[in-house]
Amino acid sequence: MIRRRYRGCTQGAWIVSVGMLFASCTSGAWKASVDPLGVVGSGADVYLYFPVAGNENLISRIIENHESKADIKKIVDRTTAVYGAFFARSKEFRLFGSGSYPYAFTNLIFSRSDGWASTKTEHGITYYESEHTDVSIPAPHFSCVIFGSSKRERMSKMLSRLVNPDRPQLPPRFEKECTSEGTSQTVALYIKNGGHFITKLLNFPQLNLPLGAMELYLTARRNEYLYTLSLQLGNAKINFPIQFLISRVLNAHIHVEGDRLIIEDGTISAERLASVISSLYSKKGSS
């Protein structure tokens, strides 16, 4: 009887200890409100909003050949939506993920033996650096990731924008998709140099089209994506040739509204879309 009571006490003490450990770990979590786009920052060449549900196959294809594929997948598996920015000059992606993360066990997940170096910001937020990728989980409901070249921004700088957000100015529809809070599965992209992206979509990567900013919205449908694209036209003298070229290559409804070329009901395979998106940050695509 005494032994049973002792065993019960030790088991209870163990449970309480673990609970206290977990509580003490989460007590230091970031509790203030967070602006995802303000954290990734302004001045990017590409912005994206990526709900994970319904788009898992596309995400797997995009990160398939990345050096930090396994580490990125750890984060994605716990993510409901990604807010991202790509910076061509420094060849880096900054990602803010909303979801459910193992905040209390980051030291076990991102261990020194696996090549991670642990550091803290002036606000006491822990982050982990490796050769290609830097990660921080400031709270159980969001994470921050930077991956890219050695010129990429330091994670401490990104985390400083939790306090002082640097929010980019983005189109109304893009903003609307970002605030859908998981109710939409639409992938949204805003690209500063629309000509660079559209030539890859047309499969004419060497063609230099004088085009402005582009908005792209994609919805998964079986193994392909249905998309709507809005492209700012540049030189009025060549607008018609550009419209003609695009209409000959893309199977979609195309028309002009003011200074914008609108492409609706276009389709693209998940494999092709992943290739085009990946080319935006690949060494070849971002040189």
From Swiss-Prot:
This is Outer membrane protein TP0453. Residues 103-112 are annotated as: Amphipathic helix 4. A mix of monomer and dimers; may integrate into the membrane as a dimer. It is found in: Cell outer membrane. Keywords: Cell outer membrane, Lipoprotein, Membrane, Palmitate, Signal. Residues 240-250 are annotated as: Amphipathic helix 8. A lipid is attached at residue 25 (S-diacylglycerol cysteine). Recognized by sera from 43/43 syphilis patients, it shows promise as a diagnostic antigen. In diagnostic tests for syphilis this protein exhibits a sensitivity of 98% and a specificity of 100%. A fusion with TP0453 (residues 32-287 of TP0453 fused N-terminally to residues 38-450 of TP0326) exhibits a sensitivity of 98% and a specificity of 99%, and both proteins exhibit superior accuracy in classifying analytical false-positive samples than a commericially available test, making them candiates for diagnosis. GO terms for cellular component: cell outer membrane. It comes from Treponema pallidum (strain Nichols).
